[in-house]
């Protein structure tokens, strides 16, 4: 390689920041600029603005933050034009990624970069098998390459001419071979409370978690891992709780999973981590009522938890929308606490192990190797 290639990398949430850092670590011979969080910045990335500005989820929530997102889109387009990277690598945050690329294609300077070889790669294939299958065609028009988590996703995109590479689920990079699975019997009754990494979801779930915690019989320890974007809010919120949970850094969450008897968790990335670590859990999610209604209309799958979808059965009980309340959580908590139910759930979670990762190679390294081969 004669010249050091430049990658403009964009991560919009914590899981993307972790994967982005793993990719950067595996590509020391490339220069990285862009948008990231604490993990990527620890490796030298100077984020052009706080990653938390992109951590918005839900149709209504995105509309509420439309002005800020528009400003960040324009800022990112300008930065890409000014820095002239060889590759734009986007990790999740598909709405933002597609808006940036669309803006570049409409900008004369952006079109000039594209004509000179600028490529667009995206990590995380949208779940077109679950809802809005038309997105596959749109992705094919937007990106030059797509990295999917699972083999079965590939045909949905290659039929439209989009080169798609299955790489396994990146969360497995931080779990497989590093942490032992949960044992089916726990002496210390530790319950992990996982309200999510986006402020919008945290604000909706924390009051529900408080009511749940205060209704659980004595004898349990509650622990909440926090990320930098939500830590201050969560610490302030729990000050008024009658039962005080322990607050730990998100960096310590895998050790928490090893010890946890059970978890109550927001739908999303954390539910995948819990499943990989064989932690019995109850999945909850409380979004804006209109977002929930639209989701019920558009989604074509019975469950939101990936482990439930992959195994085509309800392993993790799900409480979504108005069902996500303290009373229902407590009912499920009591049910899953039963020794037989608890052991059966762990056994079911172990059945998904082979689906998360095709081999022993790290996902971040696999993506890095593929990119290096292209350049």
Which residue ranges define each predicted feature?
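Nucleotide-activated sugar donor-binding and catalytic core shared by glycosyltransferases
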Residues: 1-375
């Amino acid at each position: 390689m004669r010249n050091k290639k430049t990658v403009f990398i964009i991560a919009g949430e914590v899981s993307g920041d972790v994967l982005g850092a793993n990719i950067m670590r595996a590509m020391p011979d490339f220069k990285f600029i862009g948008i990231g969080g604490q993990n990527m910045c620890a490796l030298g990335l100077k984020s052009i603005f706080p990653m938390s500005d992109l951590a918005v989820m839900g149709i209504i929530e995105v509309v509420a933050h439309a002005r800020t997102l528009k400003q960040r889109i324009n800022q990112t387009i300008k930065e890409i034009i000014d820095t002239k990277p060889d590759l734009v690598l986007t990790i999740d945050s598909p709405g933002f990624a597609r808006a940036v690329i669309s803006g570049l294609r409409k900008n004369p300077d952006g079109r000039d970069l594209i004509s000179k070889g600028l490529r667009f790669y995206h990590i995380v294939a949208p779940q077109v098998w679950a809802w809005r299958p038309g997105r596959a065609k749109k992705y094919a028009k937007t990106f030059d390459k797509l990295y999917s988590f699972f083999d079965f996703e590939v045909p949905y995109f290659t039929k439209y001419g989009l080169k798609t590479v299955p790489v396994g689920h990146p969360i497995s990079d931080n779990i497989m071979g590093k942490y032992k699975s949960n044992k089916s019997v726990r002496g210390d009754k530790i319950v992990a409370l996982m309200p999510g990494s986006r402020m919008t979801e945290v604000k909706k779930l924390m009051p529900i978690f408080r009511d749940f915690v205060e209704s659980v019989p004595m004898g349990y320890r509650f622990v909440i891992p926090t990320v930098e974007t939500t830590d201050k809010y969560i610490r302030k919120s729990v000050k008024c709780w009658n039962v005080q949970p322990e607050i730990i850094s998100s960096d310590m969450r895998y050790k928490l999973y090893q010890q946890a008897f059970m978890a109550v968790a927001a739908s999303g990335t954390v539910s995948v981590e819990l499943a990989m670590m064989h932690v019995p859990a109850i999945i909850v999610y409380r979004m804006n009522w209109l977002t929930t209604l639209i989701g019920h209309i558009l989604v074509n799958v019975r469950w939101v938890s990936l482990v439930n979808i992959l195994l085509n059965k309800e392993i993790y009980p799900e409480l979504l929308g108005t069902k996500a309340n303290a009373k229902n959580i407590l009912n499920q908590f009591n049910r899953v606490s039963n020794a037989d139910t608890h052991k059966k759930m762990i056994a079911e979670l172990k059945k998904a192990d082979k689906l998360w990762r095709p081999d022993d190679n790290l996902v971040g390294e696999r993506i890095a190797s593929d990119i290096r081969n292209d350049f």
